Amino acid sequence: MTPARRSALSLALLLVALASDLAAGLKCVCLLCDSSNFTCQTEGACWASVMLTNGKEQVSKSCVSLPELNAQVFCHSSNNVTKTECCFTDFCNNITQHLPTASPDAPRLGPTELTVVITVPVCLLSIAAMLTIWACQDRQCTYRKTKRHNVEEPLAEYSLVNAGKTLKDLIYDATASGSGSGPPLLVQRTIARTIVLQEIVGKGRFGEVWHGRWCGEDVAVKIFSSRDERSWFREAEIYQTVMLRHENILGFIAADNKDNGTWTQLWLVSEYHEQGSLYDYLNRNIVTVAGMVKLALSIASGLAHLHMEIVGTQGKPAIAHRDIKSKNILVKKCDTCAIADLGLAVKHDSIMNTIDIPQNPKVGTKRYMAPEMLDDTMNVNIFESFKRADIYSVGLVYWEIARRCSVGGLVEEYQLPYYDMVPSDPSIEEMRKVVCDQKLRPNLPNQWQSCEALRVMGRIMRECWYANGAARLTALRVKKTISQLCVKEDCKA
């Protein structure tokens, strides 16, 4: 063989060997290929990886195909979790790998440090929340005060407080102006909203009575609940009747509604009489003959004014009380009386001949009801019927007073009318049986006959208690009779 042919043959064999190697591809270590002597071939790359699994390093070695290599997924490492390498020579992945050493762990927190770490942020957040709520409430209060100031400031300027007037001055101004009813409505609102309540002095079916202070003066505040708005409105309306004001009728000062944020209170402000009701007064005190006459005359005077119609442009309609009893009569400092609680009162319009009866389901006190009311024979279309019923009740109040009158050192203990005939809270039926069927009346003790004043008072009582209402005395007649008695007893009512 010539040298030239021998060279050509060698070149051909070399090319065949190279082609064979290229066809075989890249050889790599494969830990999962135990059937092929832990070797694999690929057109892509050799792959070696170490991964942290359950706290231990796990080594993987294999081949990566060309599509997988192009996806650029297998050849990326993750800090402290995996370390991956790709290479492109035979068995280049036959290497030893380790994950990078992690930085030393931060010191663990103990119970105390952990408590501090949790508690401090919580406390700071709580304080921030409370400060935020407080700031919002303060802003709201400031807004309300500003709003209230803007609403009420004209009233204060209009009124009274700055003028230095007393309640007596205001009442006198209202009387002198010709109305004789009460201060103007703007003045009433100003007074009511500047009263400071002191203490509760009584409770009733309507609500509560409080002792209050206004500009250093004592006032009484009758507080109705919103469900008794009809009673509050009616009583305020009656008290503001033209020419009603009288020394023996409770002095009306103001009526207003007050919203305390939760519910609405209805206020009726009047003069304050520290001795309380006649009921309380008689329970605590014994009265002299002159004292008895003064009390009786003041009641008759107040009732006569209430019953009387005053004709004229500034006239007053006739009014019947409908709930006369010792608890609805107050005792003043001078030991005279003032009739109060006009919530059930009725007015008579003589021109139209109509009776203004309140739309109120409540009736008077059963113990003090006249016979015609108990047996339902009262003619409610005639106004005189209501006045006659008042007279019957006044006769019972006089009996309560007379029992506490001391004559010759003898005095009866205080009792309510019919105390020995009916229970403490009698029903209509029980009162009807005693008053209408048996025609009984409170007992007049024999010792009253030894005192002229008590004899006269006893006669007045009997004439107030007639079963026939038309036969009873009028309030004016009672007043005149007791006035004569007052002269004899040298008392000044």
From Swiss-Prot:
The chain crosses the membrane at residues 114-134. Keywords: Apoptosis, ATP-binding, Kinase, Magnesium, Manganese, Membrane, Metal-binding, Nucleotide-binding, Receptor, Serine/threonine-protein kinase, Signal, Transferase, Transmembrane, Transmembrane helix. It catalyses: L-threonyl-[receptor-protein] + ATP = O-phospho-L-threonyl-[receptor-protein] + ADP + H(+); L-seryl-[receptor-protein] + ATP = O-phospho-L-seryl-[receptor-protein] + ADP + H(+). Residues 26-113 are extracellular. The keyword Transmembrane applies. Belongs to the protein kinase superfamily. TKL Ser/Thr protein kinase family. TGFB receptor subfamily. This is Activin receptor type-1C.
